[in-house]
């Protein structure tokens, strides 16, 4: 695993001790990655991917505002109950981007589904199962009203998929969480586990948020 030190080398970041963060555990069936598409122009991680090769149940709570991002509109349109991939980009919220923002997601989804399908065909399982466009959802955070950086994100997708890994430790969870940050001063992670019936349920939380104006 390579840690991108540029995630932490900026004026707004306040380095925290590792002990301040909870130790998130490995989640079976989940692969994660975080890379730089150079959206900030400084090489820090700005794309994160959560991939469930066998699929995962999906639920969401979203804004009640009538003005939503093209990313949220994409997710709402298909009424998904299960997914295989969630890609998160920072720097650009894909809001007030109109047709360009919508078409950008179409391009990214087509390319990401193709690359993930190719990955599966080369896996030890040797599966030929297709990762479909409708198996993917997206999250975008950052500034509004700016053209969505589709070409930079598209060019970074092969590296994003190549860097997927199944083994997760605290440092890797923090790397992925750092790839979502905008003006946040540090990554945000949380962990809890409960016994449900006879089973141990692990709950890992990764979040971002800073300087939001009346979020709803």
Residue ranges and their predicted role:
Residues 111-117, 133-216:
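Glycine-rich, mobile lid/loop segments that gate access to catalytic sites or pores
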Residues 57-59, 81, 94-97, 145-148:
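Short active-site-adjacent helix-start/loop capping segments
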Residues 82-89, 216:
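Residues forming anionic-ligand binding surfaces in small-molecule and nucleic-acid pockets
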Residues 90-118:
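Alpha-helical support elements that line or immediately flank enzyme active sites
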């Amino acid at each position: 695993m390579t840690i991108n030190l540029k995630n932490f080398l900026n004026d707004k970041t306040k380095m925290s001790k590792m002990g301040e963060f909870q130790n998130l555990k490995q989640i079976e069936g989940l692969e994660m990655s975080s890379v730089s598409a150079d959206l900030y122009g400084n090489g820090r991680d700005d794309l994160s991917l959560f991939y469930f090769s066998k699929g995962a149940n999906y639920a969401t709570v979203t804004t009640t505002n009538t003005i939503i991002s093209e990313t949220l509109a994409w997710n709402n349109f298909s009424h998904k109950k299960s997914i295989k991939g969630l890609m998160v980009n920072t720097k650009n919220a894909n809001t007030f981007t109109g047709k360009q923002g919508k078409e950008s997601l179409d391009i990214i989804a087509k390319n990401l589904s193709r690359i993930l399908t190719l990955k599966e065909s080369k896996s030890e399982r040797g599966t030929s199962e297709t990762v479909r466009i409708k198996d993917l959802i997206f999250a975008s955070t950052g500034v509004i009203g700016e053209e969505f950086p589709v070409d930079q994100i598209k060019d970074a997708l092969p590296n994003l998929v190549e860097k997927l890994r199944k083994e997760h430790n605290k440092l890797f969870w923090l790397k992925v969480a750092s790839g979502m940050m905008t003006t946040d001063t540090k990554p945000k992670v949380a962990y809890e586990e409960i016994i449900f019936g006879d089973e141990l349920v692990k709950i890992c939380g990764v979040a971002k948020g800073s300087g939001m104006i009346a979020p709803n």
